[in-house]
């Protein structure tokens, strides 16, 4: 396995561990999620380039579109929560509260 694939898998693993460790704040969770999406995008781009299959080039673009939508929704949720509560703790996101 080439060293670049191992580096990308390591970046994904570190982002996943960061997501599991720093899950009390929404901003740190969003940053870790973006790191995971970036490593998945790079991995899918490298796989599409190595496969030489024309339809495989659509997968990284679709992943990038979903990552942009996820970032926009996450940032709007972060702004809404910080305007309402004054901080970005995830325990404020309970659906049982009114």
Curated annotation (Swiss-Prot):
Quick one: where is this thing mainly located?
Answer: mitochondrion
* Enzyme Commission code: 7.1.1.2
Q: Does the keyword Mitochondrion apply?
A: yes
**A GO term for molecular function:** NADH dehydrogenase (ubiquinone) activity
The record lists the catalysed reaction(s) as: a ubiquinone + NADH + 5 H(+)(in) = a ubiquinol + NAD(+) + 4 H(+)(out)
Q: What class of enzyme is it?
A: translocase
The terms describing its cellular component in GO are: mitochondrial inner membrane; respiratory chain complex I
Q: Where are the transmembrane segments?
A: 1-21, 29-49, 58-78
An annotated GO BP: ATP synthesis coupled electron transport
A Pfam family per the record: Oxidored_q2
Q: Where in the cell is it found?
A: Mitochondrion inner membrane
Regarding the membrane, this protein is recorded as: Multi-pass membrane protein
What's in the keyword line of the UniProt record?
A: Electron transport, Membrane, Mitochondrion, Mitochondrion inner membrane, NAD, Respiratory chain, Translocase, Transmembrane, Transmembrane helix, Transport, Ubiquinone
Would you identify the family this protein belongs to, as annotated?
Belongs to the complex I subunit 4L family.
What is the documented function of this protein? Core subunit of the mitochondrial membrane respiratory chain NADH dehydrogenase (Complex I) which catalyzes electron transfer from NADH through the respiratory chain, using ubiquinone as an electron acceptor. Part of the enzyme membrane arm which is embedded in the lipid bilayer and involved in proton translocation.
Subunit structure as annotated in this protein's UniProt entry: Core subunit of respiratory chain NADH dehydrogenase (Complex I) which is composed of 45 different subunits.
Q: What is this protein called?
A: NADH-ubiquinone oxidoreductase chain 4L
């Amino acid at each position: 396995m080439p060293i670049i694939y191992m580096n990308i898998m390591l970046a994904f693993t570190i982002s996943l561990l960061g997501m599991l460790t720093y899950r009390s704040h929404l901003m740190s969770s969003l940053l870790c999620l973006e790191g995971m999406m970036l490593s998945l995008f790079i991995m899918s781009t490298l796989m599409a380039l190595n496969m030489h299959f024309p339809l495989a080039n659509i997968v990284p673009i679709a992943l990038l579109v979903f990552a942009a939508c996820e970032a926009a929704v996450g940032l709007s949720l972060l702004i809404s929560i910080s305007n309402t509560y004054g901080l970005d703790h995830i325990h404020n996101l309970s659906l049982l509260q009114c």
